[in-house]
Amino acid sequence: MAEKKMWGGRFKQGTATLVEEYTESVSYDRALYAQDIAGSMAHARMLARQGVLTAEEAAIIVDGLATVRSEIEAGSFVWRREFEDVHMNIENRLTELVGDVGKKLHTGRSRNDQVALDFRLFVSDRVRVWRELGRDLVGVIVDQARQHTATLLPGCTHMQPAQPVSLAQHLLAYAWMLRRDIDRLEDCDKRARVCPLGAAALAGTTYPLDPASVADELGMYGTFRNSMDAVSDRDFVLEALFDGSVIMAHLSRLCEEFILWANPAFGYIFLPDAYATGSSIMPQKKNPDVAELMRGKTGRVYGALTTMLTTVKGLPMTYNRDLQEDKEPFIDADRTVSASLEIMAGMLREVRFNTARMRTALRSGFLNATELADYLVGKGIPFREAHHLTGAAVALAEEKGVTLEELPLEDYRGICDRIDEDVYPILEPEAAVSRRETPGGTGPRSVAAQIAELDSWLGR
């Protein structure tokens, strides 16, 4: 077995079968094949420019790598466990195709800087997908908000009725969360897409390499300043997983609200059939399983972040085999984040809002109490006293089983003689919403400004 290993020259005994099974990574890092081939092509061209390879040798290698890529994409490539990982599988097949010239590809390069390059490109590529899926979801949210600027519902704190808000304002809160997420992803991409080539195993190389030209060819933002940092750094994975975790936290919050709102106790939404499931025993059930699963899958992404933090927390310089464990958590998290963003966009696009039920809910919970307190402030009463007087009015209305709009004027005047007939229009939900035109508030002009700003950001 030892002679089959590309590193096996000093070994007399082959790798134990169980060890081979335990240490292989090709079963999952084959996902990086496109980045590995792109990096190797750029490396070969650079070697030719630097006079390490001839132009003819580089062309043969690049053509051979293109053939390997075609085989992989056609499904005819045979992945072999004994070659351990994506890099050695591709290099072995390249050598089968082009002969000994293929063995020159690895000149000036170690798997340490090779895998760092591949994984940086892979994470960057996937983060860019998350970014575009996030932008698509923001667009869906903005479109829904545009249709519901006049739809009002109870805004809550502590899951208790607090103040009336527009449904548009409620939805736009998630758009702004996702915009921050996308900003973070753009920052992450800049730090991930940095070229580590030239570091070799850890100390650099004696060959006259030009990593900057490789970085340019691969659309990277620069090169590393320290070879030891280049091969050992996995900050970019941590950052991407943190960003993915925050995205999932935001999606999970929206899922939680959809789950609650779909319950007849709220009845605010009608879930589309395509995003719900039924019960094997209860024929009437329409379960929000998609939202529940997305809420549950959030933990998988958190787990991936925790796995990576634990993996790197005690590693001495420089590369350690522990770092092989960086790919599975990210690949799993990527599947979850990508699918969740796309599915949430589809679900939100098709969900129907029960605006009549939302309107009815505005009559419970004294959501206009703050309006009464502000009204009293306008009559010259200090806010703390106005707060106390409003509390007394709420208690009286609750005792009588009426809303603040229904409380008779004589009862109001028994609490404060400055209250007059002009209090009643102020207590209407539309009045409460329309008066809140502070920047970012739920007032119509503020909501319209938010929609316009997000439309501009989306390039509409």
Swiss-Prot record:
Q: What class of enzyme is it?
A: lyase
EC number of the protein: 4.3.2.1
Biological pathway: Amino-acid biosynthesis; L-arginine biosynthesis; L-arginine from L-ornithine and carbamoyl phosphate: step 3/3
Its Gene Ontology molecular function terms? argininosuccinate lyase activity
What is the reaction catalyzed? Answer: 2-(N(omega)-L-arginino)succinate = fumarate + L-arginine
- What's any GO biological process attached to this entry? L-arginine biosynthetic process
Q: Please provide the record's keywords in A-Z order.
A: Amino-acid biosynthesis, Arginine biosynthesis, Cytoplasm, Lyase
| Protein location | Cytoplasm
Q: Record keywords: Amino-acid biosynthesis included? A: yes
Entry GO CC: cytosol
Report if keyword DNA-binding is assigned: no
Under the heading NCBIfam families, the entry gives: argH
Q: Record's family?
A: Belongs to the lyase 1 family. Argininosuccinate lyase subfamily.
The protein depicted here goes by the name Argininosuccinate lyase
Tell me which species this is from: Nitratidesulfovibrio vulgaris (strain ATCC 29579 / DSM 644 / CCUG 34227 / NCIMB 8303 / VKM B-1760 / Hildenborough) (Desulfovibrio vulgaris)
Q: Show the taxonomic lineage.
A: Bacteria, Pseudomonadati, Thermodesulfobacteriota, Desulfovibrionia, Desulfovibrionales
